[in-house]
Curated annotation (Swiss-Prot):
Residues noted as binding ATP in the record, renumbered to the chain: 37-44
Protein encoded by which gene: xylG
Chemical reaction(s) catalysed: D-xylose(out) + ATP + H2O = D-xylose(in) + ADP + phosphate + H(+)
Topology versus the membrane: Peripheral membrane protein
Keywords from the named record: ATP-binding, Cell inner membrane, Cell membrane, Membrane, Nucleotide-binding, Repeat, Sugar transport, Translocase, Transport
EC number: 7.5.2.10
Record protein name field: Xylose import ATP-binding protein XylG
Organism: Photobacterium profundum (strain SS9)
All residue ranges annotated as the ABC transporter domain in the record: 5-242, 259-504
Length: 507
């Protein structure tokens, strides 16, 4: 059988650096191929080659699609072949309707006039195909991320896509939205649509794939039948070594209470009658990792924003750090007191993309390198160099714009920023979201190094295995309330979910 897609000996260089070094992949019609690898392994570069972002002539190797050698130079040419890529960062126009987004740039006309009746009828068919029950005139900005993801797929199908490339499609989705998306991908496979699926969530990769291809350091490590591979097999191929334990727990001492939170309530920014956090109280001890678990919408991020002084709505309650009552009206108040927070969305709230790695690292501690209003460049450069070395931030140099780093290295740079302020309490909101398994492991090890130094860590995570693998104690939140405060003594995922959905409060 002739493969639908065959990419042979693909080489792509940036200067003297080989981002891709002789990569080969192929897939059949109606097949799902998952592409796995650490951040910076070359997955995205390979897909940019396939989709015309890096045009023919800008790389070496051959691409054959449906039996024909193709030499595309634009994304439009790729789409005309039937290849569509859906990026992690969605490209929809939020102010336009669903219908307008579906046909943007490909409007249906009759005698030179836009035919809205035909577009409406086609939109209804496309939305039905992706199992999205919304009116075509709905404003896209009013829909959830999961629904917007389905609109992107519908848009690709409107162009008769035969091959979908999905780049981290479930990273921002809830569990139920993820189930809907995976079911749709399976349905499309049955209809003969092929898919290249890129994800760090190896349980999804195992569940949905026919074949799994692993790339490491720009090289093709291997492609194997998904049914024959375990998660450990995938990880070993990705990182080049066997990882005996994904969560590297280390013994550490837990001391006296360092943070005390009393009766925190926070009201919705959009509706002042709705409580997002409802009368929450808890304590945190020195050298403790406190996991905060709960379903999406439980109020976890809002609670952390209150503790960091950056919640945009109205909130009340008391926070005591080492016995002293704090006034937290801004991030500056929190940082001055000794509370630092690595935010949930690093791209929107964590990094300044056009600034250098070094500038991002020292952003919160510039006063430490300033004397009489003048910045001491030598002192700052020394601190940057030490931070990059201590957190193993992989960057050619500190002057590179941080947007060019992988997600894991961006996250480590943000961590470096807040460690420079010498915090007593470090809040990590979804610290490993969207980063690969190797970078996750490094961040877990760093967390244990920090608590050994006496720093107390609050970790918010939607990944229950992560919460159970790292935390000393777990707070379980549901609908703004704490439903459980549990010592992590062989806790199970079922116990946490039962606690979240139970009417009782568990301690």
């Amino acid at each position: 059988m002739v493969p639908l897609l065959k990419m042979t000996n693909i080489v792509k260089c940036f200067g003297t650096v080989k981002a891709l070094d002789g990569v080969n992949i192929q897939l059949q019609q109606g097949e799902i191929l998952s592409l796995c690898g650490e951040n910076g392994s070359g997955k995205s570069t390979l897909m940019k080659v396939l989709c015309g972002i890096y045009p023919h002539g800008d790389f070496e190797g051959e691409i054959v699609f449906d039996g024909q050698v193709v030499e595309v130079k634009t994304i439009a040419e790729t789409e005309a072949l039937g290849i569509a890529i859906i990026h992690q960062e969605l490209t929809l126009v939020k102010e336009l309707s669903v219908l307008e987004n579906l046909f943007l740039g490909a409007e249906i006309e009759t005698f030179g006039v836009l035919d809205f009746d035909r577009m409406h009828a086609e939109a209804v068919k496309l939305l039905k195909k992706v199992k999205l029950d919304v009116p075509p005139d709905t404003r896209v900005g009013d829909l959830g991320v999961g629904q917007q993801q389905l609109i992107e797929i519908a848009k690709a199908l409107s162009k008769n896509a035969r091959l979908l490339v999905l780049d981290e499609p479930t990273a921002p989705l809830t569990e139920s939205e993820t189930d809907i998306l995976l079911e749709l991908v399976n349905d499309l496979r049955e209809e003969g649509v092929s898919c290249i699926y890129i994800s760090h969530k190896l349980n999804e990769v195992k569940a949905i794939s026919d074949q799994i291809c692993v790339i490491r350091d720009g090289q093709h490590i291997g492609t194997r039948d998904a049914k024959s591979m375990t998660t450990d097999d995938i990880i070993t191929m990705m990182v080049g070594r066997e990882m005996k334990q994904l969560f590297p727990r280390e013994e550490h001492d837990i001391g006296d209470i360092v943070l005390e939170v009393k009766n925190i309530s926070a009201w919705s920014k959009a509706n002042s009658h709705i409580r997002k956090v409802d009368d929450v109280s808890f304590v945190l001890r020195k050298g403790e990792i406190l996991g905060v678990s709960g379903l999406v919408g439980a109020g976890r991020t809002e609670l952390m924003e209150c503790l960091f002084g950056c919640y945009q709505g109205r909130y009340s309650g008391e926070v005591y750090l080492q016995g002293q009552k704090l006034t937290l009206q801004s991030c500056h108040d929190a940082l001055d007191a000794g509370i630092a927070m690595v935010p949930e969305d690093r791209k929107r709230h964590g990094i300044i993309p056009i600034m250098s790695v070094g500038e991002n690292i020292t952003l919160a501690s510039l006063t430490a390198f300033t004397q009489s209003g003048v910045l001491n460049d030598v002192k700052e450069a020394s601190a940057i160099s030490e931070s990059i070395k201590a957190l193993t931030v992989k960057t050619p140099n500190a002057d590179l714009a941080i947007k060019h780093l992988s997600g894991g290295n961006q996250q480590k740079a943000i961590l470096a920023r807040f460690l420079l302020v010498n915090p007593t309490v470090l809040i990590l909101d979804e610290p490993t979201r969207g980063i690969d398994v190797g970078a996750k492991y490094e961040i877990y090890k760093l967390m244990f190094q920090l608590v050994k130094q006496g720093i107390s860590v609050i970790m918010v995570s939607s990944e229950l295995p992560e919460v159970l693998g790292i935390s000393d104690r777990v707070l379980v939140m549901h609908e703004g309330k704490i439903k459980g405060d549990l010592i992590n003594d062989n806790l199970s995922q079922e116990q946490i979910m039962d606690c979240a959905l139970s009417e009782k409060v568990t301690a």
